[in-house]
Amino acid sequence: TREEAMRLSCDTLARLMETVGDTPIRLGIETMGKRNQLGTLEEVIEQCKVDPHFHPVVDFGHLNARGVGGQFPDRDSYRRVFHTIADKLGAEYATHLHCHFSKIEFTDAGEKRHVTFEDAVYGPEFEPLMEAIIVDNLCPRIICESDGTMAEDALAMKRYWRERRGESAK
């Protein structure tokens, strides 16, 4: 069952940290895009509670694909993710969240493949994410995972963010 898989994963993570001991290294646990895998936001948060060295890695495209689209229609839908993490793990986890972002094609089972920002069929859109980051004064690390256009799409995000903040869009 899913509950048994969660118990086993948390036990494994605890044993890992017993073996590793105290370390300055943070270990990321990522949200997943396929519905039959562990990796909902709630599951990742529970896994991160095993040890303070574990930090959530939120892939917004994965969460959108898991929910078969439409998960992030506006700024507030992104803000809820950051607020949930802050409430359950602490503000520092949310403020400096490590994120992945791309649009993702999906089926009823979840993630199928990463696509580019040019894709008009699949989401999510990045603009509301940038607005959420600005309004809540967050400082996340965002890795763009677009298929074949990572640099171009990452630059589009950066430009949008800077323009919204009133900075030069270099």
Task: Go through each PLM region and give its residues.
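Short helix-capping segments at alpha-helix termini
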Residues: 18-24, 49-53, 89-93, 135-137, ...
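Gly/Pro-rich active-site loop or hairpin
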Residues: 38-41, 64-139
